From Swiss-Prot:
It comes from Streptococcus agalactiae serotype III (strain NEM316). Required for the insertion and/or proper folding and/or complex formation of integral membrane proteins into the membrane. Involved in integration of membrane proteins that insert both dependently and independently of the Sec translocase complex, as well as at least some lipoproteins. GO terms for biological process: protein insertion into membrane; protein transport. This is Membrane protein insertase YidC 1. A lipid is attached at residue 21 (S-diacylglycerol cysteine). CDD domains: 5TM_YidC_Alb3. A lipid is attached at residue 21 (N-palmitoyl cysteine).
Amino acid sequence: MKKKLKTFSLILLTGSLLVACGRGEVSSHSATLWEQIVYAFAKSIQWLSFNHSIGLGIILFTLIIRAIMMPLYNMQMKSSQKMQEIQPRLKELQKKYPGKDPDSRLKLNDEMQSMYKAEGVNPYASVLPLLIQLPVLWALFQALTRVSFLKVGTFLSLELSQPDPYYILPVLAALFTFLSTWLTNKAAVEKNIALTLMTYVMPFIILVTSFNFASGVVLYWTVSNAFQVFQILLLNNPYKIIKVREEAVRVAHEKEQRVKRAKRKASKKRK
């Protein structure tokens, strides 16, 4: 059910973004509410462009937006982590009720809901943050591509309106994309082909796409993905998650051994 809800939410969100993805110039005279939001983002970037450095404004505004959304990101990652932890038990339930008849489906759903409640897991908790984050990031992207005064200027000798001729920003954007996906998937309880492919395919797509995008847009991708890496290490460090998980397994194993020893002693005393 969670997959269906997430798929529906992504379809709905994609449809909404496609409606909002016009390519025309956005200005203070633009008519739609979405374009006014995009223009407000652009003006905020301009206000943060100290010494008329649009590149600096892009960096600062991206960091501010990302920092504001950190609680939502944390909520999403915590929910995803909990869902990963109970995946083996969910698969056991699916094996227990393999039937496709309504009665089996109902029993499976009831036991899954009981497990969610017992473990404090909300299967929908990772959807809401996603619905909020993506429109904000899309508005920021459109501000960089549809507002004229953000398409001019230089940053570290790079023309923000032109692709990076030295390929520095595309490589950095791809590198930070790889690191963020790799770190996110490192602590996954169960590895699968889809996760592995995403780890390597997404950075490649970002790299190739960035060759033809304006440097201002690629600068935004680079800063955004770099901040994503920082967020993961700060809030959902996979090394800490793995360490805690291994410690829990060790404690459970020791407890099991103590119970076995106690049973053996009790058995010897009876003899």
